[in-house]
């Protein structure tokens, strides 16, 4: 099965290439914190030889509570992203929530992310696709993996085949998500790169009444399970003080654990991709 390669700057992303990392923080809490977090990611990924893209949100439009922190907004967010790119020379990924945001965000960011909750919104999908930017498509918690082909077709019909799929867990009753490992193989059949968002797969949506809970202690186990499927890469959020993060702290890896965490995953990824495929159908 041929696997497509997506290029982001100098980075080549594909299911049969060494894993890449979309990593950063959940939301831009401040300029200084964004620079601090990105600096550590750049140091660790450079040491380990992992292709790296910085990620963060400028606006968390789907928070549980109307009083929850959302971020600096588009204008200030783009200024921070521009500074991150200038300081560290890395590509940047961020999510957009409304069609009008797609074009201005694409002027700054290298990858636009289609949020899971909004992944069937055709007007948003088409607006993002028409920017010609690479699009990271989050699989909605309520969609089966095979249904992702319809979102891919929408993007292709709008003229964009620079696409990445991203698993982030499936609703399992109330306030819980699970990851179906068989889903990775189904999505890889579409030939586009597949990533695993281990951070949000650890969520317990609404688990803290007015915000999401999480299971940070299981991040290594779940990440290893995902990477064992031979994926294009991992989507990860880390924070120097997760217990006081302004969004999704219960799911975030502690920043000081980033190097040992990624070192193990890079070794596992290399091992898995050494194995020749076995036809069992």
Curated annotation (Swiss-Prot):
What EC number(s) does its UniProt record assign?
Answer: 2.5.1.55
Q: Which InterPro entries match?
A: Aldolase_TIM, DAHP1/KDSA, KDO8P_synthase
Q: Which domain of life is it from?
A: Bacteria
Q: Which UniProt keywords apply?
A: Cytoplasm, Lipopolysaccharide biosynthesis, Transferase
- Protein's GO biological process: keto-3-deoxy-D-manno-octulosonic acid biosynthetic process
Q: In which pathway is this protein known to take part?
A: Carbohydrate biosynthesis; 3-deoxy-D-manno-octulosonate biosynthesis; 3-deoxy-D-manno-octulosonate from D-ribulose 5-phosphate: step 2/3; Bacterial outer membrane biogenesis; lipopolysaccharide biosynthesis
One Pfam family this sequence matches? DAHP_synth_1
- Its main localization is cytoplasm
Keyword field contains Transferase = yes
Q: Which reaction does it catalyse?
A: D-arabinose 5-phosphate + phosphoenolpyruvate + H2O = 3-deoxy-alpha-D-manno-2-octulosonate-8-phosphate + phosphate
Q: Name where it's found.
A: Cytoplasm
Q: Name one GO molecular function term.
A: 3-deoxy-8-phosphooctulonate synthase activity
Gene Ontology cellular-component terms listed: cytoplasm
Family assignment from sequence similarity? Belongs to the KdsA family.
Name listed for the protein in its UniProt record: 2-dehydro-3-deoxyphosphooctonate aldolase
Q: Which gene encodes it?
A: kdsA
């Amino acid at each position: 099965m041929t696997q497509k390669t997506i290029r982001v700057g100098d980075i080549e992303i594909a299911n049969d290439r060494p894993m890449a990392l979309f990593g950063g923080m959940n939301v831009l809490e401040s300029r200084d914190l964004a620079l601090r977090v990105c600096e550590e990611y750049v140091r660790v990924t450079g040491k380990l030889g992992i292709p790296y893209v910085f990620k963060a949100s400028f606006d968390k439009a789907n928070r549980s509570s109307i009083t929850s922190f959302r971020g600096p907004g588009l204008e200030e967010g783009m200024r921070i992203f521009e500074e991150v790119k200038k300081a560290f020379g890395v590509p940047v990924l961020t999510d957009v929530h409304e069609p009008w945001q797609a074009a201005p965000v694409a002027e700054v960011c290298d990858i636009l992310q289609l949020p899971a909750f909004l992944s069937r919104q055709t007007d948003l999908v088409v607006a993002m696709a028409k920017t010609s930017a690479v699009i990271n498509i989050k699989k909605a918690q309520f969609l089966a993996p095979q249904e992702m082909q319809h979102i891919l077709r929408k993007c292709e019909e709008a003229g964009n085949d620079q696409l990445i799929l991203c698993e982030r867990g499936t609703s399992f009753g109330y306030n819980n998500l699970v990851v179906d490992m068989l889903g990775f193989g189904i999505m890889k059949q579409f030939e586009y790169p597949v990533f695993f968002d281990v951070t949000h797969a650890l969520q317990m949506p609404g688990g803290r009444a007015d915000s999401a809970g999480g299971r940070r202690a299981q991040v290594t186990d779940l990440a290893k399970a995902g990477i064992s499927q031979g994926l294009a890469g991992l989507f990860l959020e880390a924070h120097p003080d997760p217990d006081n993060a302004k969004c999704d702290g219960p799911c975030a890896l502690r920043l000081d654990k980033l190097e040992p965490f990624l070192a193990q995953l890079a070794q596992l990824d290399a091992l898995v991709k050494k194995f020749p495929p076995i036809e069992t159908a």
